[in-house]
């Protein structure tokens, strides 16, 4: 079984808004946001500052935390 962490993260956008997301590759996902290939919400709102990240053992647990935060 592959040992893979899932992350909930919060980005601060340049317009002082926040974006919360879930990923299993935090560096790759933030790079996607920076390059305009992340979520529709973050397109044109970079650069971003990573304010928070927390690892979870499963995607399900990470998604539950994302919902709780939002």
Question: How would you describe each model-predicted region?
Answer:
Residues 1-39, 48-53, 61-70:
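GIY-YIG nuclease catalytic motif and its immediate N-terminal context
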